């Protein structure tokens, strides 16, 4: 029986989940929910189903894998990764995965703040990258070395 991934009909938070499902060659179906046009942004397609799925915390994205029902994008990613032994075997490897997961979240949040800003534009991005708030690393620096990796 295929897993079921539910999310809005956009890339958003579910896109990393889709990529991991594809990478792991996981059999899954997708349920996409539409949002109506402005100014109402009708969400009734999702709201009509939201409380019928048996989710502990009804939200999007969600993943249903048999009796396992998950929400929250990072919890879903970790669940899939654990199923496919992608979370490391040693404590050191698991720590690295934890750190990288949180670093990716920080980068994603910083980019979202820029992209969803009402003042979004190249001047704004350029100013941010020249400011003291912009941190190029540690992932993008030569110092970001994991032992002998």
Where in the sequence are the language-model features?
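C-terminal helix/juxtamembrane-tail motif
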Residues: 1-4, 131-149
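GST-like domain detector, emphasizing the conserved glutathione-binding G-site
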Residues: 1-126
């Amino acid at each position: 029986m295929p897993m079921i991934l539910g999310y809005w009909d956009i890339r958003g938070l579910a896109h990393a989940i889709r990529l991991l499902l594809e990478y792991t060659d996981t059999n899954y179906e997708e349920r996409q929910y539409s949002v109506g046009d402005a100014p109402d942004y009708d969400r009734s397609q999702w709201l009509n189903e939201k409380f019928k799925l048996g989710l502990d915390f009804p939200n999007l994205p969600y993943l249903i894998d048999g009796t396992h029902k998950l929400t929250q994008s990072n919890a879903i990613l970790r669940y899939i990764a654990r199923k496919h032994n992608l979370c490391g075997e040693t404590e050191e490897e698991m720590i690295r995965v934890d750190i990288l997961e949180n670093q990716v979240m920080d980068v994603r949040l910083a980019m979202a703040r820029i992209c969803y800003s009402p003042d979004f534009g190249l001047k704004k991005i350029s100013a941010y990258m020249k400011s003291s708030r912009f941190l190029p690393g540690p992932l993008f620096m030569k110092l970001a070395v994991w032992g002998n990796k």
